[in-house]
């Protein structure tokens, strides 16, 4: 076991504080409409430029192991805030830095660290309740545009694109961000349910100019099994042929004579048919087939339920207004499923999302939810260079997370004003003893830090502006972009309540742990023995050369 380097008390806390300040100072320059860029060196390729707090935080590793521990703990604050709300990482880092700095001063002055932490926790819990009281619901397109614009660093085009996407696919719809091919940002909306499976044979194509399969008002056969024997399909094929409608087959796989016979029938015009593999794998495939069956009002032919393909009838088949199949995707538009059944399925998936433990499961469930609820929108980000593209894509993703958070929990006045108002309302909050009161004051003082930093980044005097804002009421605040005072809601400067709440909670949690740290342990650096080892073989080789 490697020897350890151990530091205690004030010596440990000073080292940790240095690390906290290095990371936070690098991150906080990005805050606000006049925040600066940070250039990140890469091991290969061009450096990347960002104004995203968590991207800066993730790049920072310090040489001194004790300082690095402090930096990594604040990095955890940024990451947790990012995971919870998708934004607010810079605010969270700044709050943590302020609480740690003020808290460690109090510890050095002889205060009890545990009581300080209790005071901080009490202030944070009360502040979260006050934030909920200040929160206003965010449902109209204008408010969503404003939130997206602020989070994308005042890029109005991005804000309006996100609002348009949410309007078209609904608040639960899937919105993905991709790198575009041109200079302009674009929005592409896919209505209906789309999944990543294309046609099994190019001979199914009936639109040769576009290379796709289009089926109008088709029947849809869903089977949770491999189909290789055409005989078991003959009864249903004959029924479909008599109806004169096309047929889409979605199965685990379709191969051998079954596929060959379908291709021949399709080319001869006997039955207009197309076949695709079912989306997903294992249990996920079963669930997605069930989703499709509910959307199209059909039944999944499953051997697990002792159902046989040859006994299936037209009543077992789903229906839709239109199906479009490309080489890679299948889109079902206008499924005839009953609304109450679809809504019940949506509610069931929402419950599964709440119960899911892994991020992967949540992601897949969210995709399924969106496909049932509304559709899929793709935001294609345009830029002149690759460096700009990456920076802009990160901003658009942040803005998207922020708008989702705003729809979920509402919005509060932005520009650091909400936290200043909360701190003002809690000025009479008291703990059980004086040390807890100091902890409360530390947390309330930290709530001014985001506003102070926004003002500082815009080149103004933080104390003067902060006092002016504190003298005002309600949503009165400072617009750093235009250098004027007024109602932040009227200015369109909004922050999602969830983002502000998450930033405060995670900052308070980690900062409280750091204040109560009394000992730090790390590995001693290993001695470099390479120079001694390097000289021995050289001498040996020389001796061998002499022998030869």
From Swiss-Prot:
Origin superkingdom:
Bacteria
Task: Give the protein's biological function.
Answer: Together with its co-chaperonin GroES, plays an essential role in assisting protein folding. The GroEL-GroES system forms a nano-cage that allows encapsulation of the non-native substrate proteins and provides a physical environment optimized to promote and accelerate protein folding.
Q: Which PROSITE patterns match?
A: CHAPERONINS_CPN60 (PS00296)
Main location class: cytoplasm
This one is known as Chaperonin GroEL
Where is the chain membrane-spanning?
Answer: none
Chain intervals for the UniProt region annotation (Disordered): 526-548
UniProt GO molecular function:
ATP binding; ATP-dependent protein folding chaperone; isomerase activity; unfolded protein binding
Give the location in the cell: Cytoplasm
Q: Among the record's GO biological process terms, what is one? A: protein refolding
- Family under the similarity heading: Belongs to the chaperonin (HSP60) family.
Q: Keywords for this entry?
A: ATP-binding, Chaperone, Cytoplasm, Isomerase, Nucleotide-binding
Protein source organism: Buchnera aphidicola subsp. Pterocomma populeum
Subunit comment for this entry?
Forms a cylinder of 14 subunits composed of two heptameric rings stacked back-to-back. Interacts with the co-chaperonin GroES.
Q: HAMAP family annotated for this entry? A: CH60
Q: Give the CC-aspect GO terms.
A: cytoplasm
